[in-house]
């Protein structure tokens, strides 16, 4: 089994990978340019578990992990930070911390919606936004018509 601690950022990620069968530890930084991330994770054989800290720019990564059928655990940022005695942030150290918490079975996993649930939420949020926009336009047009003394029947 391969266990990966990952410190994910917008342009790159630092990883610490442990192969539990060989005991080999590998540390690496992956740029998010081209297909470097996809190539790296698709090259991993056997069962793989990846641990990342929750952040705003992680949806693409979760989709990639789901596509590659890799188990990805998302951790609570404050609880991950509380597990580290040193308060100094460092990408390499953060990746090693995530790896250590995964190995010790202390990784503070949070609940994440499934892809279907995320899609439904996005659809509902977008629909709500369009309905509000339509209402705003209707109200504006009504105000313009009333300001110009235009009425059509008793309704307006």
Where are these regions (language model features)?
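A detector of single, family-specific signature residues
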Residues: 1-156
């Amino acid at each position: 089994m391969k266990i990966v601690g990952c410190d994910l950022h917008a342009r790159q990620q630092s990883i610490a990978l442990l192969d539990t069968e060989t005991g080999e530890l590998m540390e690496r930084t992956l740029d998010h340019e081209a297909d470097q991330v996809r190539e790296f994770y698709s090259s991993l054989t056997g069962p793989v578990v990846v641990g990342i800290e929750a952040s705003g720019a992680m949806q693409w990564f979760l989709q990639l992990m789901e596509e590659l059928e890799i188990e990805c655990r998302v951790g609570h940022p404050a609880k991950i930070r509380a597990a580290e005695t040193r308060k100094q942030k460092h990408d390499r150290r953060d990746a090693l911390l995530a790896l250590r918490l995964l190995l010790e079975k202390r990784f503070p996993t949070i609940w994440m919606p499934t892809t279907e649930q995320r899609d439904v939420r996005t659809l509902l949020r977008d629909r709500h936004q369009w309905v509000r926009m339509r209402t705003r336009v209707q109200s504006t047009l009504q105000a313009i018509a009333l300001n110009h003394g235009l009425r059509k029947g008793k309704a307006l």
